[in-house]
Amino acid sequence: MVLKFSVSILWIQLAWVSTQLLEQSPQFLSIQEGENLTVYCNSSSVFSSLQWYRQEPGEGPVLLVTVVTGGEVKKLKRLTFQFGDARKDSSLHITAAQTGDTGLYLCAG
């Protein structure tokens, strides 16, 4: 079975002073059930924290995790989230993807 994953680029408003761009890659991904996947989120700016969300079709985004400390790694079942040491990047790794993992994954800072 082919699973489809989507990631999105979010514009983030920090206070009301400037707009930061978070870039996620890949933007779209189709994999076979049981395969692993990694989604990356990068910025030129330092974030005090970073959040990952998952959105199912027709639903609002649901917070999966917040990472705060540079180098921090958090696990949620088969999902592993890592916040880069410099707090400018993060990754989401899904081990042995299942049909229930299908959705839109978003990072926000």
UniProtKB/Swiss-Prot annotation:
GO biological process, one term: response to bacterium
GO cellular component assignments: alpha-beta T cell receptor complex
Disulfide bridge map: 41-107
Keyword set, alphabetical order: Adaptive immunity, Cell membrane, Disulfide bond, Glycoprotein, Immunity, Immunoglobulin domain, Membrane, Receptor, Signal, T cell receptor
Signal peptide region: 1-19
Residues bearing carbohydrate: 36, 42
Its biological purpose: V region of the variable domain of T cell receptor (TR) alpha chain that participates in the antigen recognition. Alpha-beta T cell receptors are antigen specific receptors which are essential to the immune response and are present on the cell surface of T lymphocytes. Recognize peptide-major histocompatibility (MH) (pMH) complexes that are displayed by antigen presenting cells (APC), a prerequisite for efficient T cell adaptive immunity against pathogens.
Assembly and binders: Alpha-beta TR is a heterodimer composed of an alpha and beta chain; disulfide-linked. The alpha-beta TR is associated with the transmembrane signaling CD3 coreceptor proteins to form the TR-CD3 (TcR or TCR). The assembly of alpha-beta TR heterodimers with CD3 occurs in the endoplasmic reticulum where a single alpha-beta TR heterodimer associates with one CD3D-CD3E heterodimer, one CD3G-CD3E heterodimer and one CD247 homodimer forming a stable octameric structure. CD3D-CD3E and CD3G-CD3E heterodimers preferentially associate with TR alpha and TR beta chains, respectively.
Protein name (database record): T cell receptor alpha variable 27
Source species of the chain: Homo sapiens
